[in-house]
Amino acid sequence: MVIGPFINASAVLLGGVLGALLSQRLPERIRVSMTSIFGLASLGIGILLVVKCANLPAMVLATLLGALIGEICLLEKGVNTAVAKAQNLFRHSRKKPAHESFIQNYVAIIVLFCASGTGIFGAMNEGMTGDPSILIAKSFLDFFTAMIFACSLGIAVSVISIPLLIIQLTLAWAAALILPLTTPSMMADFSAVGGLLLLATGLRICGIKMFPVVNMLPALLLAMPLSAAWTAWFA
């Protein structure tokens, strides 16, 4: 039985609850500065993943086509609508952030928690090897990340633990079918595309550039097939 997804989801859940409880006691300067630090950390992780790229054209094409599909399907608009409805469930919060700021930050952390290369690879790795160490290490970071964001976004951060658990359990259980079909170069290109998404997420959290990160998610589905095709036809 896999345990990593449950540990990771619990870390987000507890971090979100603790952050919401401490929101009135944690100084604003710490919350603001730490949010920027987490954005910077996301940028750093993204860079480390991007440099692993094995086939640059495949990575670029997957990102471009994935973003195009996301734009056509209006993925981020759909998420924004769902998040706006979720926000209405927490109107009793004493310190409710502005609607636009809430939407932007909430969408960013959904991607940060649920679509990070570390989480996806960690879940797949545990599904194949039974080793939960990657997800356990990620849980420490996610606990403090959730706590900091919950100070400004409230208990809604804890809700992210539900899709996080579902995604990671699905990946872990499907890993036995997926990983035998992959090659090291496919995994490298998949990680590189995830790194680009983390770079976009980091820039978004820092407020530098509001990339439509959710619209870029289909790129993750295209990364491995395009990498395999590029290797077969051009490498």
Curated annotation (Swiss-Prot):
Subcellular location: Cell membrane
Keyword S-adenosyl-L-methionine part of the UniProt annotation: no
Flavoprotein listed as a keyword: no
Highest taxon in the source lineage: Bacteria
Topological type in the membrane: Multi-pass membrane protein
Keywords, comma-separated and alphabetical: Cell membrane, Membrane, Transmembrane, Transmembrane helix
Protein name per UniProt: Uncharacterized protein YqgA
Organism: Escherichia coli (strain K12)
